[in-house]
């Protein structure tokens, strides 16, 4: 594995800035070059999975959509099950749902009702922490299922959007780990 001190540098070097996407004035952080690089992608998933030794977990939850791309290999590396949290209407069968507010409107996420239960210790994985709205809804959803949130891990945090300040009070001491700060 890549030396721990060099991992943030490696990851940052594989993220491409795309100006004015998806709209003028936005600098989009494209992680597809990182995903295409097997050394960088392995370093990322190994680093996120390593937290299992510090904070025991039973399952990994990935938030739609890029949280699936990161969360599934983290679960495999950690020897845990992977649970997708999806936009409403995308999962068949019985689901639990959680509504949340967006800047302009609202949204809803779901999980299969049988996928989480009392005694589960869950790590939430996503690509980016921005305002924290989706992550907050996921925390509420996981707790409503009877499971415990034992951490939130993201590739990068957009600190200027205040997601950490929103989430830390409701994480009840569970760690919020961002490998890169933007």
From Swiss-Prot:
UniProt GO molecular function: adenine binding; adenine phosphoribosyltransferase activity; AMP binding
GO cellular component: cytoplasm
Superkingdom of this protein's organism: Bacteria
Enzyme Commission designation: 2.4.2.7
Enzyme type, top EC level: transferase
Stored InterPro entries: Ade_phspho_trans (IPR005764), PRibTrfase_dom (IPR000836), PRTase-like (IPR029057), UPRTase/APRTase (IPR050054)
Catalytic activity: AMP + diphosphate = 5-phospho-alpha-D-ribose 1-diphosphate + adenine
Alphabetized Pfam families for the sequence: Pribosyltran
UniProt KW RNA-binding keyword: no
Pathway annotation from the record: Purine metabolism; AMP biosynthesis via salvage pathway; AMP from adenine: step 1/1
Residue stretches spanning the membrane: none
Any GO BP annotation: purine ribonucleoside salvage
Keyword Cytoplasm: yes
Keyword annotations: Cytoplasm, Glycosyltransferase, Purine salvage, Transferase
Localization of this protein: Cytoplasm
Record function comment: Catalyzes a salvage reaction resulting in the formation of AMP, that is energically less costly than de novo synthesis.
Family: Belongs to the purine/pyrimidine phosphoribosyltransferase family.
Subunit structure: Homodimer.
Name of the protein: Adenine phosphoribosyltransferase
Lineage, highest ranks first: Bacteria, Bacillati, Actinomycetota, Actinomycetes, Kitasatosporales
GN (gene name): apt
